[in-house]
Design a protein with these regions (language model features):
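N-terminal amphipathic/basic-hydrophobic helices that include classical n-h-c signal peptides
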Residues: 1-19
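N-terminal beta-strand motif that seeds the catalytic metal site of vicinal oxygen chelate
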Residues: 13-36, 93-94, 149-161
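A generic structural signal for short beta-strands and their flanking turns/coil linkers
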Residues: 24, 56, 65, 90-92, ...
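Vicinal oxygen chelate
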Residues: 25-33, 61, 81-161
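Core segments of cupin and vicinal oxygen chelate
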Residues: 31-76
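A short, polar/proline- and glycine-enriched secondary-structure boundary/capping micro-motif
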Residues: 78-82, 156-159
């Protein structure tokens, strides 16, 4: 991944900061109630490509990371909630940071597929360091997902609130 940002040294003097990073894909295994229904969600709604599978689990390319869905018919999908920017955020949750210019199209695609948002797409920390678009929804097994996008990707790990 290449992060590019314009930095100001002093009045009318700017430089371009280029940060080269190589992300190591993460692995996440989550419980699902029904394997067939969950395959449909991750493949046909989120567009994830299926890899290896058995009768009890399936691997997915989740935006370059490895997501494994495992059958747990007793999974209740309950979550705790914490307040962030005045919104009740489901905990735990997982997701992906997508490009700023793709966020609205992705949100529209989810709406077209009748995905109910727990937190509707909106801009969080508007005008502040770490300004981002975010949205939360559940998969068909009650696992909370967050998709977000940063206006300035170099602020992904900002310590300023």
């Amino acid at each position: 991944m290449v992060l590019i940002s314009l930095k100001r040294l002093e009045r009318n003097i700017y430089y371009i900061e280029i940060i080269m990073t190589k992300l190591t894909p993460f692995h996440l295994a989550i419980p699902v109630k029904n394997l067939s229904e969950s395959k449909d969600f991750y493949e046909n709604i989120l567009g994830c490509k299926r890899g290896r599978e058995s009768n009890e689990w399936a691997d997915y390319d989740f935006f370059g990371h490895q997501l494994v869905i495992h059958v747990d018919p007793n999974h209740e999908g309950k979550s705790h909630h914490n307040e962030v920017d005045g919104k009740s955020v489901p905990i735990p949750h997982f997701g992906v940071v997508i490009p700023w210019d793709d966020f609205d199209k992705f949100a529209d695609m989810l709406s077209t597929n009748n995905i109910h948002f727990v937190i509707e797409p909106y801009v969080r920390f508007e005008g502040l360091p770490g300004e981002q678009k975010t949205m939360f929804f559940y998969d068909n097994s009650g696992n909370a997902l967050e998709f977000k996008s940063f206006k300035d990707m170099s602020m992904l790990f900002s310590t300023k609130i």
